[in-house]
Design a protein with these regions (language model features):
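Membrane-integrated ABC transporters
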Residues: 1-203, 217-221, 225, 247-264
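Alpha-helical transmembrane segments of multipass membrane proteins
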Residues: 169, 205-217, 234
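Short, well-ordered alpha-helical packing segments
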Residues: 181-188, 209, 213, 237, ...
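Short cytosolic helices in intracellular loops of multi-pass membrane proteins
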Residues: 229-248
Length: 264
């Protein structure tokens, strides 16, 4: 049992869990550091436990848990850095509220929980062959080849990047809600200085980020789709043509309804 725990800590998720627990401990142990609310720090320990418990789940779902763990660190850490005055006011104004970090922990817990459901396992059994494969990167596609040494690792990193981009988009949408509140408050109070500040120094950066994130998200998702379908096509052809499978099918008891035409 002890050996299993040590082995779990040596995995990528295990190392990430240790770093997350250390970050949460730092926020609690050093009162001189401007820290987020107590529940945000405690959520870090919960995140560490979720990361360790996720070692045995699907390779596809591990990506989600890992990204949410990184999201917690970024959100909690950025609010702490902003509280220390190390970020420009314009950047600090764009940050979501502190409780957004706990949202990442909740989503990670949901992913861990649903990973044990049979319908979800049926889906991940279809997705995992691509994300767990160790084949060399597809030569025909140059996009994101530097993301890993195997096609499976590239796929996992692209999924992680896509989730992170969507996570940023949700945080940006939340920040837009606070912008609407502040700018309408300035209109109600006839505060011209606050109005122009919100319009020029908050809305313009938010709108620019929103457009950039939307375009980048489309680029990442399209790249993942192309790479995944290319690998699936190669895998299907290899299984169909390898070891004379297509010759031996007529001599088995299994019925095949024009598989060659379906592949085409």
């Amino acid at each position: 049992m002890g050996d299993r725990r040590v082995a779990a800590l040596r995995t990528g998720l295990g190392i990430q869990a240790v770093l997350t627990a250390l970050a949460a401990l730092i926020l609690l142990a050093f009162p001189g550091i401007p820290s987020p609310p107590l529940y945000v720090s405690l959520a870090g320990f919960a995140m560490a436990g979720i990361l360790i418990a996720s070692n045995g789940i699907s390779a596809y779902l591990k990506v989600f848990v890992s990204v949410y763990g990184v999201g917690y660190l970024l959100l909690a850490g950025s609010k702490t850095v902003a509280a220390m005055g190390l970020l420009p006011p314009v950047v600090a104004a764009l940050l979501p509220p502190a409780f957004a970090a706990t949202g990442a922990v909740v989503f990670a817990a949901i992913v861990l929980g649903i990973s044990h459901l049979e319908p979800i396992r049926a889906i991940t059994n279809i997705a995992d062959p691509y994300f767990a494969n160790r084949d060399k990167p597809t030569k025909e596609i140059g996009l994101f080849r530097w993301f890993g040494t195997t096609e499976g690792r590239i796929g996992r990193n692209l999924v992680a990047l896509s989730i992170f981009v969507n996570f940023a988009d949700v945080a940006l949408t939340l920040r837009f809600n606070f912008f609407y509140r502040d700018i309408y408050n300035s209109l109600q109070e006839y505060d011209a200085n606050a109005f122009w500040y919100q319009l020029l120094w908050v809305f313009v950066p938010l709108a620019t980020l929103n457009i950039a994130i939307g375009m980048f998200d489309l680029f990442v998702d399209s790249s993942l789709l192309i790479r995944w379908r290319t690998w699936l096509t190669h895998s299907l052809y290899e299984r169909w043509l390898g070891n004379g499978t297509h010759y031996r099918i007529p001599f088995t008891d299994e019925e095949a309804d024009n598989p060659d035409q379906r592949i085409q």
